[in-house]
């Protein structure tokens, strides 16, 4: 808006920059774009500003769906693929919000089918793995931040913590500002070892350096939101190395989300230093690719 025409018309930008960089991986065009925008971008990287921070170790932890959970996932994938393959381009464009809702339901099955199916009595591979990680961490004297996009999933995990005799705090969007700050102060000072936080409610503005383990229960389209959540523990005042676990349902859409995050983040960071999920801008074939499952 301040410099109209600086990056040409969209058609010219698409032909000279976007397609060569995004589709063809043209390094020369990428460097050309970098040179053009570098004078207008101010980046402050935590690794450069806070060189005395302890290490941050990130690990993807995979859980394999089995039994009834796997059957429900496969059935939902097949239904979505049949729906997408039968749509015209016009229908696809007009129904992207509904398609995104279906993808969200698929992610919920990965988390725990009980989020969708009230009568579900089977297991959740990720919930079992998450509880094992938390129990081991608490047993070793660590404090844990547990993030999920789904508040209903946090409630199910909290029930598991209660059953295991592990104390916790719970922060969702329904918690008022005063109560929120009270919980933050208490967690940093007392012996309660787990803080369950919805990603949207607690992704920014909290200082929780008493924790040195962060668990992301479900990957989200926007990796920047997850990074901001991790930074509730990995920030000024942190004295210990921070271990970050990202739980992923193996051979599912969650693996595809992580790959998409990495690809989008790599491209965006090369240009500006930020990343964002672009699910609503996907083409039908790209969405179908998200649903593909490797052959056993």
What positions do the PLM features span?
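SF2 helicase/translocase ATPase core recognition
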Residues: 1-13, 50-78, 179, 183, ...
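Conserved P-loop NTPase motor "coupling/switch" region that bridges the ATPase
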Residues: 1-46
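Short glycine/proline- and charge-enriched loop/turn segments
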Residues: 15-21, 162-169, 211-212, 216
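Generic recognition of well-ordered alpha-helical segments
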Residues: 2, 32, 36, 40, ...
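Soluble or luminal CAZymes and related metallo-dependent hydrolases
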Residues: 25-33, 41, 98, 122-129, ...
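Cytochrome P450 catalytic domain signature, combining two hallmark sequence patches
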Residues: 79-86
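Alpha-helical structural signal
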Residues: 37-38, 96, 146, 180, ...
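Conserved Helicase C-terminal RecA-like lobe
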Residues: 49-74, 87-206, 277, 283-296
